[in-house]
UniProtKB/Swiss-Prot annotation:
InterPro entries registered for this protein in UniProt: NSFL1C_SEP_dom_sf, SEP_domain, UBA-like_sf, Ubiquitin-like_domsf, UBX_dom
Residue ranges with Acidic residues bias: 95-104
Chain segments carrying region Disordered: 39-179, 236-293
Gene Ontology CC terms, in alphabetical order: cytosol; nucleus
GO biological process terms held by the UniProt record: autophagosome assembly; Golgi organization; membrane fusion; nuclear membrane reassembly; proteasome-mediated ubiquitin-dependent protein catabolic process
UBX domain: residues covered: 292-369
Domain of life per record: Eukaryota
Domain SEP: 185-258
Protein name (Swiss-Prot/TrEMBL): UBX domain-containing protein 1
Record's function text: Involved in CDC48-dependent protein degradation through the ubiquitin/proteasome pathway.
Record organism: Emericella nidulans (strain FGSC A4 / ATCC 38163 / CBS 112.46 / NRRL 194 / M139)
Amino acid sequence: MNPAEHDEAVSQFCAMTRARPDEAQEYLATNGWDLEAAVTEFFAEQDETAGSSEPTGQPSAKSSSSTPRESSSSRKQPPKKFATLGDLASGAADSSDDDDDENQDFFAGGEKSGLAVQNPDDLKKKIIEKARRTQLPASDDSEPRRNYFTGPARTLGGEDTPSRVIDTPSGPAQPQIPRRVRRTLHFWADGFSVDDGELYRSDDPQNAEILNSIRQGRAPLSIMNAQHGQDVDVEIKQHDEKYVRPKPKYQPFAGKGQRLGSPTPGIRAPAPSEPAPAPQSSSGPPKPNVDESQPVVTLQIRLGDGTRLTSRFNTTHTIGDVYDFVSAASPQSQARPWVLLTTFPSKELTDKAAVLGDLPEFKRGGVVVQKWQ
């Protein structure tokens, strides 16, 4: 390769790994200027560094913290602004020795067995410190391209060629990769919470294990609301005050509704055809006794189930006669309490002795509505 090709390979290596030019030249020279092999070796060494085990935290480990820890693969990376769970895991081993003399452990267990749990407040400080030293890498994940045209197809035919249907090609279903999600980790004076969730108190040793998992780059599925194998970006927010339960978010079109056309809710039933003023038949509802020689008014009655009835009454009939007619016409009215009322303005008709001709709403007929109680 000529010098121009070498410079091009170094530029591509730096763009893919964010390494310095001298590091890129070293990896490329080691792998015979094979760009793919050099990049593979670079990321493999980064994974080995991130997966290194943490010290046990014993007092004897304090002396070993003075020994050089930098290897040929742990090269200085450009400063970052945000942190992911993987970045927190890669920096966990580097800072554990420095904090051994400040760790305060909790102990949980019985008389003959116990478990040492690290202080949650100390874990919160470590997570925040590593988030300040790192940044979120540029996401290479792109949303899967949506196919808007699915299903069978049909070809256009002509005079000599008929149209034909092309079925959907059957192939192996591709596994769907869950999309990267973002969660907000809130640190409060008395614990921590995720997004708008409940408080995890600092004095609970079990919650310290959750923080330790986050510090090591593992997202607990129980509190992160994520799927197995799903990438999670964690944004850290620190609060000086104690936990305050967030107010519920306003959701429009939530709760119960009431259908239009009736002052009472109910299930709309198909409205039967209005009976014509004809002699009573055995199939229709019972009709009140009407004296044709006396003034007659027509009342439209809207039942609570949506059914509409029309009946003729004399002006000498009472509200009680209307109650009797509704009770006889609707079997459902005999099983639950109800009341009749007028419309616009709505007023309950509780005086069953009132005469229709004496009520201004019914002197010339009107509408009566049944309301369930």
